[in-house]
């Protein structure tokens, strides 16, 4: 019975510690899932921002394609003049809002910070070896004080 406990106790504690580590801090654990959910929310927000920028750029493209006033203002800013026009540079007049629109930025993906499965197994083995070591020390101390 004593040998049975010396084997079962470290083994069960090692397996339980592996289960707890993998469940909470493993690659598919609770911590990793929370990080992935937060990343998903950020990506959805980023996609919505890019969709808004896309609508703004589509409006600018439509204005530059079909609106004569916008085409004329943009052409004048580039230095073109219609035949018969006098070249006058208006003060405080820019079409700078067309130049401030960009197509968006790339968002780097970050890997979730969690333990790999191998690391969880190594920690569980360390727990098992630590329990075996404690059993050996406790048994030798008990034998020492018994005499």
Swiss-Prot record:
GO CC term, one of those recorded: plasma membrane
Main location (coarse class): membrane
Record's keyword annotation contains Transmembrane helix: yes
Tree of life domain: Bacteria
Pfam family, one: DivIC
Transmembrane segments: 4-26, 123-145
Bilayer topology annotation: Multi-pass membrane protein
InterPro entries for this protein: FtsL/DivIC
Keyword Metal-binding: no
Record key words, sorted: Cell membrane, Membrane, Transmembrane, Transmembrane helix
Subcellular location: Cell membrane
Protein name: Uncharacterized protein TP_0181
Organism: Treponema pallidum (strain Nichols)
């Amino acid at each position: 019975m004593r040998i049975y406990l010396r084997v079962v106790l470290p083994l069960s504690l090692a397996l339980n510690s592996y289960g707890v580590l993998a469940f909470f801090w493993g690659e598919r654990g609770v911590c990793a899932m929370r990080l992935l959910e937060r990343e998903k929310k950020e990506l959805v927000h980023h996609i919505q921002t890019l969709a808004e920028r896309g609508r703004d750029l589509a409006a600018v493209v439509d204005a530059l394609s079909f609106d004569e006033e916008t085409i004329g203002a943009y052409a004048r800013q580039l230095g073109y003049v219609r035949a018969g026009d006098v070249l006058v540079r208006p003060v405080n007049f820019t079409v700078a809002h067309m130049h401030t629109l960009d197509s968006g930025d790339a968002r780097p993906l970050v890997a979730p910070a969690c333990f790999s499965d191998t690391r969880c197994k190594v920690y569980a083995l360390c727990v098992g070896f630590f329990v075996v070591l404690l059993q050996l020390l406790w048994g030798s101390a008990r034998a020492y004080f018994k005499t």
